[in-house]
């Protein structure tokens, strides 16, 4: 099979990369009704599989789970989760032939095997759903022409999909129809109903393409979302300890610092995150972020280039075929780092202390978010898609580090994200080695001393922060989410 994106001509590639439209709330007036009375069979019962299924059932849909025979016979975790939540469970042969919509929510590396197993069993005119388009775009999976292929991609981990639904809301979601597989022209109706059934329409839905979702998703997770957090954690910890900081304190400052810093990011973007600093610290964080952007720009561009060309995917799929040798080696090495093995700090660190003593971390977040966004947009991805795949998801990933350090992050994210994370972080750490030797007192681990600030310089820095394109689109999208949340609660 050929990489689907690489079979397109340049005009088609640009059109699909640039497909992105924020959908109006009234486009979802029919809710999930298009799928009511139809049989929806989910393949896979991991975090996305279970939680999307719970939401869809609560929205009135007929949901069951198709699992492999051995998973049922051995009563594996997927079987236990589905049965304990009261779902009907059966083999592919028992459930797929009756399905109107088959939703493939297994890990990326299993998609080809799953699709090849279920496709011959699917009835004529059925639909096949994904929550990530890797199998279609990068693997180039060929789907029967009578089958409609759609995607509903919540921009959050599966647990968040469920928790937001229970609160009467949802999570921002991308939907798409594969242009090669929409024989009856009903793909968008199916995708909209599925998104509504998960609650996504209450938080904002972008009509996108399989191509735009995959290329932007891969870029975000490799760079700012996972790779930058991992590289930053290792670099900052080693720097603090080398300067004489207690390893336990250093570990806590970093482990919980990302979450604290990005909570401000979630509420008010880079502007609010920077506003949490004193004026001297803000000026220093800005200067550091500009240095970091200049150093790291070629690395971000290389990752985007390799994603666009398919080089990244072919390398990762070669590792799949080699029993994940690289992935497992990198995972083991990460687990042995000084940051991961440091003792826990029993003392308390106040919220503002994370900002005051984490100026470098804030600079890394700012530089990474802006670089990821700028690099995606320069490659033809629309700003709204680039925002969701950079700034929006960062607090969610930072939260996983707060739970159990880098181990937890790498367990929670997909194997695809984990592989890309290691590629980036293994390149980024040595790239920033010299930069780390230029840090000043107050950049990390101690607060910057109060001092005189040049008004004109502060004015210009504030303007530069607020006028960045990601701040403009972020303010708009966060406003949509806030407005929709008010409507959802009122309703």
Curated annotation (Swiss-Prot):
Its cofactor is Mg(2+). It holds the Pfam family KARI_N. The gene is ilvC. Binds 2 magnesium ions per subunit. Pathway: Amino-acid biosynthesis; L-isoleucine biosynthesis; L-isoleucine from 2-oxobutanoate: step 2/4; Amino-acid biosynthesis; L-valine biosynthesis; L-valine from pyruvate: step 2/4. Mg(2+) 2 binds at residues 217, 389, 393. This is Ketol-acid reductoisomerase (NADP(+)). Residues 15-208 form the KARI N-terminal Rossmann domain. Coiled coil: none annotated. Signal peptide: none annotated. Mg(2+) 1 binds at residues 217, 221. It comes from Klebsiella pneumoniae subsp. pneumoniae (strain ATCC 700721 / MGH 78578). Involved in the biosynthesis of branched-chain amino acids (BCAA). Catalyzes an alkyl-migration followed by a ketol-acid reduction of (S)-2-acetolactate (S2AL) to yield (R)-2,3-dihydroxy-isovalerate. In the isomerase reaction, S2AL is rearranged via a Mg-dependent methyl migration to produce 3-hydroxy-3-methyl-2-ketobutyrate (HMKB). In the reductase reaction, this 2-ketoacid undergoes a metal-dependent reduction by NADPH to yield (R)-2,3-dihydroxy-isovalerate. NADP(+) binds at residues 45-48, 68, 76, 78, 108-110, 158. PROSITE patterns: KARI_C, KARI_N. It is an enzyme of class 1 (oxidoreductase). GO terms for molecular function: ketol-acid reductoisomerase activity; magnesium ion binding. The keyword Oxidoreductase applies. Belongs to the ketol-acid reductoisomerase family. The keyword Oxidoreductase applies. It catalyses: (2R)-2,3-dihydroxy-3-methylbutanoate + NADP(+) = (2S)-2-acetolactate + NADPH + H(+); (2R,3R)-2,3-dihydroxy-3-methylpentanoate + NADP(+) = (S)-2-ethyl-2-hydroxy-3-oxobutanoate + NADPH + H(+). The active site is at residue 132.
């Amino acid at each position: 099979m050929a990489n689907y994106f690489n079979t397109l001509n340049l005009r088609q590639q640009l059109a699909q990369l640039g497909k992105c439209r924020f959908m109006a709330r009234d486009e979802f007036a029919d809710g999930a009704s298009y799928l009511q009375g139809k049989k929806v069979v989910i393949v896979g019962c991991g975090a996305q599989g279970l939680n999307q299924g719970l939401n869809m059932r609560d929205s009135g849909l007929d949901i069951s789970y198709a699992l492999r025979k051995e998973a049922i016979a051995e009563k594996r975790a997927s079987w236990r989760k589905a049965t304990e939540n009261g779902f009907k469970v059966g083999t592919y042969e028992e459930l797929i032939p009756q399905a109107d919509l088959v939703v493939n929510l297994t890990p990326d590396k299993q998609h080809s095997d799953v699709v090849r197993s279920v496709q011959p069993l699917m009835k004529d005119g059925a639909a096949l759903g994904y929550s990530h388009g890797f199998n279609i775009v990068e693997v180039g999976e060929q789907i029967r022409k009578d089958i409609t292929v759609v995607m509903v991609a919540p921009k959050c981990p599966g647990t968040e999909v469920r928790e937001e639904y229970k609160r009467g809301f949802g999570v921002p979601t991308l939907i798409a129809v594969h242009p090669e597989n929409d024989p009856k022209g009903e793909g968008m109706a199916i995708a909209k109903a599925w998104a509504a059934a998960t609650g996504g329409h209450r938080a904002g839905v972008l009509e996108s393409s399989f191509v735009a979702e995959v290329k932007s998703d891969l870029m975000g997770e490799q760079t700012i979302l996972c790779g930058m957090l991992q590289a930053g954690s290792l670099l900052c910890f080693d720097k603090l300890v080398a300067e004489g900081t207690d390893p336990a304190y250093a570990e806590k400052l970093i482990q919980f610092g990302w979450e604290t810093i990005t909570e401000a990011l979630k509420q008010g973007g880079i502007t609010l995150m920077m506003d949490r600093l004193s004026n001297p610290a803000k000026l220093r964080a800005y200067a550091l972020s500009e240095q970091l952007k200049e150093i790291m720009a070629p690395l971000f561009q290389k990752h985007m280039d390799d994603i666009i060309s398919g080089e990244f995917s072919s390398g990762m799929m070669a590792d799949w075929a080699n029993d994940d040798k690289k992935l497992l080696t990198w995972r083991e090495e990460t687990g042995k780092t000084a940051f991961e093995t440091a003792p826990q700090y029993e003392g308390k660190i106040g919220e503002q202390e994370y900002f005051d003593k984490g100026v470098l971390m804030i600079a890394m977040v700012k530089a990474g978010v802006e670089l990821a966004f700028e690099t995606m947009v320069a490659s033809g991805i629309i700003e709204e898609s680039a925002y969701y795949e950079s700034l929006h998801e960062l607090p969610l990933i930072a939260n996983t580090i707060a739970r159990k350090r880098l181990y937890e992050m790498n367990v929670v994210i997909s194997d695809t994200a984990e592989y890309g994370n290691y590629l980036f972080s293994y390149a980024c750490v040595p790239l920033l080695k010299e930069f780390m030797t230029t840090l000043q007192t107050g950049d990390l681990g101690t607060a910057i001393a109060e001092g005189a600030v040049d008004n004109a310089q502060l004015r210009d820095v504030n303007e530069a922060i607020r006028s960045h394109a990601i701040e403009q689109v972020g303010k708009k999208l966060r406003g949509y989410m806030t407005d929709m949340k008010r409507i959802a609660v009122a309703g």
